[in-house]
Design a protein with these regions (language model features):
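Linker/hinge segments immediately adjacent to helix-turn-helix/homeobox DNA-binding domains
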Residues: 149-166, 572-581, 585-594, 598-608, ...
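Amphipathic alpha-helical "lid/sensor" segments that cap RecA-like P-loop NTPase cores
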Residues: 97, 115-167, 179-183, 189-193, ...
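Alpha-solenoid helical repeat architecture
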Residues: 271-272, 282-283, 321, 357-368, ...
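Helix-turn-helix DNA-binding segment
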Residues: 685-734, 738-740, 747-757
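C-terminal boundary/linker of central alpha/beta nucleotide-binding cores
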Residues: 124, 166-245, 255
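Alpha-helical sensor/transducer elements of the RecA-like P-loop NTPase core
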Residues: 12, 60-128, 132, 138-146, ...
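Extended alpha-helical scaffolding segments used for macromolecular assembly and cargo binding
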Residues: 250-323, 331, 340, 344
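Conserved P-loop NTPase "ATPase switch" module shared by AAA+ and STAND
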Residues: 38-58
Length: 758
């Protein structure tokens, strides 16, 4: 059985496979349908349009024919899913079902199809054609016709083919649906994934679930996501969206999106609800949901995702809500518009002072002001030495009720999370004794074990042995998970991974992070995954996993230097590290450039150290003398706080710079850094080293020789194994070393592994 939506080439594939055989072809759509006599001159019965075989008597007749004629072959074609009445044959192993991906062409198949039509395209065009068509027969056949006529592949031609496909769907699919199913199919197109409940709310049709089942049985245009959850095939969804825009006026579309917004609101999916309400133009609902969403996700990085909706609100509506004013102040700060942030802070202060102190709205405003005093990135951490005790007293007096914080901003660090607490590190022992209670009280769940984790991280950054502190933290991990927040857990396990890397156990660090990632993914705590994946990428840099680093850089790196997003700063720095490892120093410098003003304005000392160290490496590789200035700036900042590991973590990449820089403010401090860098260089000698590029391809014989080199065979053993003279082996080895851009046999093995040659 071939089961696939319209356009996947079921009929053409079947006829090609059955060429030369005695075939009896019938269509279940034929009102005069009748099965051929068993003794007829046919070996294969081809039944097309099986989705229209609805009569139970005809179904039973076909089943009987299959059972009673085991010597015959039956090929069934359907646009729908496999019907239940054929399930016994599948379970018995006599029915094989081929789906859409079995019929879709791979990249090589697309290339052969075009070649058969006398069409030559570039590799880039071939890749684009395969991705755009998804290997589907209909768009490929339409494209081949145009290209064979001399037209060039372009976006304009893609649009022409899309319109031709839409005409095909109009005639062969859409026109055959009843009006009720047509309307439902169109109205569900903007909402994916969807199920019966969403279908009922959006369409207002109590029979929506039943119609969905019928629609799928007849077209298989839906892809099951999970039980009672579907999405359309992308090509068909684009067609339905096009159809919806053509057949519905603006008022009906707004009403449709409003109903979709209601469904998502009821299911507390506020991201999708806001998207729908913005399409419907309902600013009142947008305002209401932004307030509700901020209460569900206080202090988290939802501001980035929600920014377009905040920006579309009228100012008078924002000024009526302390929650929205607070959000605008934080949002402007995250966009580095500190003047705008302070303007909104002033508006919130005015809101509080213009009402009686006992007014609950004034209390809400005071609570939000206290939150901003602690959370705004432009507020210094030195000032927080007074802010925390003040907030502690107000909480005790029940004058404010603080929203929750994200003390780490979803980063694997407390010292360098929502704030950079480097200045506190100078007096970490004293502050632990005096501020631990007020800080943990003010932060509530976010304060559980915070002080212990911060203390361990502070000592770690200063180069101390934190083994016992880490053991103590790991013993408290269950308490953090029970009473605290995943933010602190991420900080603790992030610190554990860093200590493992620092002791030469990067493989253990990767396992630590992968285990945490699996748990976060299973519990749908997706807000941590981007930074967790970036940290995994850093571990892969230590391990020399070029392919994994390249994959992260290609698929997950931010790559938006024109619009700095502060919540992505850890990823920007990781991106620059990846670009250095990939040998693109100019790209690394471009990635880092927007971070410098932020580091200066918000006193981000630890990020500044990384920024200047990475820029020093890039300039050093480019033989730009400016590398000394960059390195001096990084070392000066590290020396100010006596930080060791923010520098030594860059090991082999930074060691030659430090050894030749001439920095002379403190010889003992420099010696500590140098020893730490040497130790990391021993553990990870190729850290951030640009990947080697081959100077030419290896011949078949050279590949065989390389495999034997990697198996630690001597030249004599290689000659004996391949039946060639020793002198010839030496020539091959010499050529291999040149092509791999290495000088020794041991380096050849490492290069071959990284280049996936063995």
């Amino acid at each position: 059985m071939f089961s696939a939506p319209c356009g996947f080439g079921k009929t053409a594939s079947a006829r090609a496979l059955l060429a030369g055989k005695r075939v009896c072809a019938i269509s279940a759509e034929d009102p005069e349908l009748s099965l051929p006599a068993p003794g007829g001159k046919w070996d294969v019965l081809l039944v097309d349009d099986l989705q229209w075989l609805k009569d139970s008597a005809e179904q039973e007749a076909l089943c009987a024919a299959i059972r009673e004629n085991p010597e015959k072959k039956f090929v069934l074609l359907t646009r729908g899913t496999m019907p239940g009445w054929l399930l016994p044959f599948q379970l018995a192993g006599v029915l094989t079902v081929l789906g859409p991906w079995d019929l879709a062409l791979d990249r090589d198949g697309v290339d052969r199809l075009l070649a058969q039509n006398g069409i030559a395209v570039s590799d880039t065009e071939l890749t684009a054609i395969h991705i755009e068509s998804r290997g589907c027969a209909l768009p490929l056949s339409l494209l081949a016709r145009h290209l064979a006529a001399g037209e060039k592949y372009s976006s304009a031609l893609t649009d022409v083919i899309r319109r031709e496909m839409y005409s095909h769907f109009d005639e062969l699919v859409f026109s055959r649906m009843d009006l009720e199913t047509r309307r439902l199919a169109m109205e569900l197109a903007p909402f994916e994934p969807f199920g019966p409940e969403l279908a009922r709310i959006v369409s207002g049709n109590s029979r929506a679930g039943e119609l969905l089942e019928q629609f799928q049985a007849e077209t298989s245009a839906l892809r099951p996501e999970r039980i009672d959850s579907y999405s359309y095939w992308p090509i068909f969804r684009r067609y339905l969206l096009w159809k919806l825009e053509r057949e519905q006026d603006e008022a009906r579309l707004r009403a449709l999106y409003a109903r979709g917004g209601l469904y998502y609101e009821l299911n507390e999916d506020y991201d999708r609800a806001l998207e729908c309400y913005s399409r419907s133009g309902d600013s009142g609902k947008i305002s209401e949901l932004l307030v509700r969403n901020s209460e569900l996700h206080p202090g988290l990085g939802h501001y980035d995702e929600m920014e377009p909706y905040y920006r579309m609100l009228p100012e008078r509506e924002i000024l009526s809500s302390p929650v929205l004013i607070q959000a605008m102040s934080m949002l402007d700060a995250m966009c580095m518009d500190y003047e705008g942030s302070e303007r909104w802070y002033g508006a919130l202060s005015d809101f509080a002072s213009s009402r009686r102190r006992s007014d609950m709205a004034a209390r809400e405003a005071r609570s939000r002001l206290a939150w901003l005093d602690l959370a705004l990135p432009q507020r210094s951490v030195e000032g927080m030495l007074d802010t925390f005790p003040k907030a502690f007293r107000l909480l005790k007096a029940k004058e404010i009720k603080l929203p929750s914080f994200s003390v780490t901003s979803c980063l694997p660090s407390l010292m360098n999370g929502g704030k950079d607490f480097s200045p506190w590190s100078r007096k970490d022992d004293l502050l632990y004794k005096t501020l631990r209670v007020p800080v943990e009280t003010v932060l509530g769940r976010d304060g559980v074990c915070l002080a212990d984790c911060a203390m361990a991280e502070s000592k770690f950054e200063k180069g101390e042995n934190v083994k016992d502190r880490m053991l103590s933290l790991m013993s408290k991990l269950s308490r953090i998970r029970r009473d605290g927040t995943p933010d602190i857990e991420f900080a603790v396990l992030g610190l554990l991974a860093r200590t493992q890397i620092d002791s030469g156990r990067a493989g253990d660090a990767k396992q630590t992070l992968l285990t945490l990632r699996s748990r976060y993914e299973a519990e749908e705590m997706t807000r941590f995954l981007p930074n967790l994946d970036a940290m995994l990428c850093r571990v892969d840099m230590y391990l020399g996993n070029d392919t994994e680093v390249d994959t992260w850089h290609r698929e997950k790196a931010p790559k938006d230097p024109q619009r700095l997003r502060l919540m992505k700063r850890y990823r920007y720095i990781t991106q620059a590290m990846a670009e250095l490892m990939l040998g693109d120093e100019d790209a690394a410098l471009l990635t880092l450039a927007p971070l410098e003003p932020y580091c200066e304005a918000c006193s981000r000392y630890l990020d500044s150290i990384s920024l200047h160290l990475l820029r020093a490496v890039a300039r050093w590789r480019q033989k730009d003398p400016g590398w000394r200035r960059e390195l001096d700036t990084a070392l000066d900042t590290a020396y100010e706080f006596r930080f060791i590991r923010p520098v030594t973590q860059y090991g082999a990449a930074v060691l030659p710079l430090v050894e030749g820089c001439g920095w002379n403010k403190d010889a003992q401090f420099l010696n500590e850094l140098t020893e730490g860098l040497k130790q990391q260089a021993v553990y990870y000698p190729d850290f951030l080293r640009p990947r080697r590029k081959m100077t030419g391809p290896l011949s078949a014989t050279e590949r065989q020789v390389l495999r034997l080199i990697c198996a630690d065979k001597s030249n004599a053993e290689i000659g004996e194994a391949l039946g060639i003279k020793l002198a010839t082996v030496k020539v091959h080895v010499s050529h291999i070393l040149v092509k791999l851009n290495v000088s020794r046999r041991g380096e050849a093995k490492t290069a071959a592994e990284k280049l996936r040659l063995i």
